């Protein structure tokens, strides 16, 4: 059982490293960073508490929203999904990401107070 799991993981990593464009790898690293930041905030909330509750909610909502926007960007700029997003260039998708991210962070900063 564990040998098959190891072989599946090694094959996944091999194919990911060989066939994924550099642009998507960079975006995946950003997604991992956001995921770890959100997990760290949630762990801190469980261990220490949520005294400044608005601050915790703002940070966590920022992580979740940024993750969702980045996944949307990754889906749109993936070359395998080009047929689904014919009218949207990668530059347009990135501009949409920047605009939505700016709005998200303005709302988050307003929520902090």
Swiss-Prot record:
<feature type="transmembrane region" description="Helical">
    <location>
        <begin position="93"/>
        <end position="113"/>
    </location>
</feature>
<keyword id="KW-0256">Endoplasmic reticulum</keyword>
<keyword id="KW-1133">Transmembrane helix</keyword>
<feature type="topological domain" description="Cytoplasmic">
    <location>
        <begin position="2"/>
        <end position="30"/>
    </location>
</feature>
<feature type="transmembrane region" description="Helical">
    <location>
        <begin position="53"/>
        <end position="73"/>
    </location>
</feature>
<feature type="topological domain" description="Lumenal">
    <location>
        <position position="52"/>
    </location>
</feature>
<comment type="subunit">
    <text>Component of the oligosaccharyltransferase (OST) complex. OST exists in two different complex forms which contain common core subunits RPN1, RPN2, OST48, OST4, DAD1 and TMEM258, either STT3A or STT3B as catalytic subunits, and form-specific accessory subunits. STT3A complex assembly occurs through the formation of 3 subcomplexes. Subcomplex 1 contains RPN1 and TMEM258, subcomplex 2 contains the STT3A-specific subunits STT3A, DC2/OSTC, and KCP2 as well as the core subunit OST4, and subcomplex 3 contains RPN2, DAD1, and OST48.</text>
</comment>
<dbReference type="GO" id="GO:0006915">
    <property type="term" value="P:apoptotic process"/>
</dbReference>
<dbReference type="GO" id="GO:0008250">
    <property type="term" value="C:oligosaccharyltransferase complex"/>
</dbReference>
<keyword id="KW-0007">Acetylation</keyword>
<feature type="modified residue" description="N-acetylserine">
    <location>
        <position position="2"/>
    </location>
</feature>
<comment type="similarity">
    <text>Belongs to the DAD/OST2 family.</text>
</comment>
<keyword id="KW-0812">Transmembrane</keyword>
<dbReference type="InterPro" id="IPR003038">
    <property type="entry name" value="DAD/Ost2"/>
</dbReference>
<keyword id="KW-0053">Apoptosis</keyword>
<protein>
    <recommendedName>
        <fullName>Dolichyl-diphosphooligosaccharide--protein glycosyltransferase subunit DAD1</fullName>
    </recommendedName>
</protein>
<comment type="function">
    <text>Subunit of the oligosaccharyl transferase (OST) complex that catalyzes the initial transfer of a defined glycan (Glc(3)Man(9)GlcNAc(2) in eukaryotes) from the lipid carrier dolichol-pyrophosphate to an asparagine residue within an Asn-X-Ser/Thr consensus motif in nascent polypeptide chains, the first step in protein N-glycosylation. N-glycosylation occurs cotranslationally and the complex associates with the Sec61 complex at the channel-forming translocon complex that mediates protein translocation across the endoplasmic reticulum (ER). All subunits are required for a maximal enzyme activity.</text>
</comment>
<comment type="pathway">
    <text>Protein modification; protein glycosylation.</text>
</comment>
<feature type="topological domain" description="Cytoplasmic">
    <location>
        <begin position="74"/>
        <end position="92"/>
    </location>
</feature>
<dbReference type="GO" id="GO:0006487">
    <property type="term" value="P:protein N-linked glycosylation"/>
</dbReference>
<keyword id="KW-0472">Membrane</keyword>
<dbReference type="GO" id="GO:0006486">
    <property type="term" value="P:protein glycosylation"/>
</dbReference>
<dbReference type="Pfam" id="PF02109">
    <property type="entry name" value="DAD"/>
</dbReference>
<feature type="transmembrane region" description="Helical">
    <location>
        <begin position="31"/>
        <end position="51"/>
    </location>
</feature>
């Amino acid at each position: 059982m564990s040998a098959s799991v190891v072989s599946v993981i090694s094959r996944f990593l091999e194919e990911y490293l060989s066939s994924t464009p550099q642009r998507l790898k960079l975006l995946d690293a950003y997604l991992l960073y956001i995921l770890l930041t959100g997990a760290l905030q949630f762990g801190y909330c469980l261990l220490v508490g949520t005294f400044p509750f608005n601050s915790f909610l703002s940070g966590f909502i920022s992580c979740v929203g940024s993750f969702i926007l980045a996944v949307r960007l990754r889906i749109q700029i993936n070359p395998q999904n080009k047929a689904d997003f014919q009218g949207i260039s990668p530059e347009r998708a990135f501009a949409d990401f920047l605009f939505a991210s700016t709005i998200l962070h303005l709302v988050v900063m307003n929520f902090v107070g």
